[in-house]
Amino acid sequence: MPTIDALAERLDEYLEPAQVKAVRRAYYYAEQAHDGQMRKSGEAYVSHPLAVASILSSMHMDHESLMAAMLHDVIEDTQVDKQGLEDQFGITVANLVDGVSKLTHLEFKTRAESQAHNFQKMAIAMAKDIRVILVKLADRLHNMRTIGAMRPDSRRRIAKETTDIYAPIAGRLGMHDLKIELEDLAFAAYHPMRYRHIKAAVAAARGERKALLQQVQIALEDCLDHDELPGLIGGRQKHLAGIYNKMREQSKSFREIMDVFAFRIVTNEVDTCYRILGAVHHLNLYRPVPGRFKDYIAIPKSNGYQSLHTTLYRAGSGVHTPIEIQIRTKEMDDIANHGVAEHWFYKNTNSRAQRAHN
C-alpha cells in the first residue's frame, strides 16, 4: 500500500517543492474528511484516493490533478461541498473534483446508450478540462485492481461498465497501458474461468516459443550493432482480453492468434527510426512482408500515436510465423503508452524549461 511520504518522494522528481506540499495538504485534508470511513476490503478509505493519486503520478500528471485525486470522493462521501474545497484549494481543484463527482453519477446501462447520450456527457466534461477524465480513469483503475472485495454481481456490473465505457475512452485518449490493464482486469472479473484458461495457455505457448524469440532478438541486436544504430529491443506480449476478443470476433483458434512474434525497437531520434527500418528490411534470413508497412510517424493516428510498423518472415525456413516490429522514439513510446497524460507532461516540462531559460 502506498504512503504519502513515498508518493511525495516520487513527486519530488518532477514537481516543484511548493506543489508537492500542496499535494500533501490535500491528502491530509482527505484523510480528515474520510475519517472513520472504510473500504469494503477493510482498509481505511483514504487509501483509495492516495492510490488514485499514485497512479496519476506514474503518468507525471500535474499537482492540481493529484490534489483532485486526493479529494475526488470528498463531495460525494463527506459533508464537504464544492465551495468548501474552493475556499481551501482554489477554484481549479474544486472544479476538477466537482467534475469527477458528476461523472460518478452517470449510469451506463447499455452499450448503445453509453456510446451515444452518456458518451456525449463525458465528451463535454473532457472539453472543459481533460484532467477530469484522467482522474476518473485512475479512479476506475484502482477500483478494478481491488474489485475482489465486491460481491459477484457487483463485480460483473462494474467489469461490463469498464469494458464498454472506460477502456474505450482510455483508447481514444491514446492511453494504451491503462486501456489494456482495464480490459484484462474486467475480463478476469467477468469471465474468471476463461481468464484463467487463457492465462495458462499463454504461459505454455511462451515457453514453447522461447528459443525462437531469442533467435529473432539476437538477429535484431546484431543488425543494430552492425550498423551502429542505437535502440532498445523488447518483446511485446499480447494481453489476455485482446487474445480472447480476437478468438471470439475473428473466429480464430488460440494458436492462430498467438502465432505471431512481436518486437518493439525504441531509439532516440526520428531519423534513426527510418535508418533502423532500412536495416531490419535487409536482415540476413528475414524478408519484409509486402503491403504490411505502416508509417504512423509521417501520418499519426487520431489519438496522437506515432510509430513505424513492419512485418518480416524467415525466408526459406518453412516457418511462416510473422515477426511484427514497431520502431519509435522514446517520446513516441511514452505517448503511445500514456496518451494525453504524457502530452501533458511533455508540455509542462517544456514550459518549465522555457521559464528557467528566460
Show which residues each predicted segment covers.
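Short acidic, glycine/serine/threonine-rich loops at helix termini
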Residues: 79, 107-112, 146-149, 243-247, ...
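Phosphate/adenylate-binding "loop-and-lid" substructures adjacent to NTP/NAD/dNTP-binding pockets
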Residues: 45, 84, 106-107, 114-120, ...
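Divalent metal-dependent catalytic cores for phosphoryl transfer on phosphate-bearing substrates
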Residues: 45-201
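Long beta-strand-rich cores associated with HINT superfamily self-processing modules
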Residues: 245-358
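Short, contiguous pre-domain boundary segments
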Residues: 1-15
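Hydrophobic alpha-helical scaffolding
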Residues: 16, 42, 75, 112, ...
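Short flexible coil/turn linkers enriched for glycine and charged/polar residues
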Residues: 59-63, 91, 127-130, 163, ...
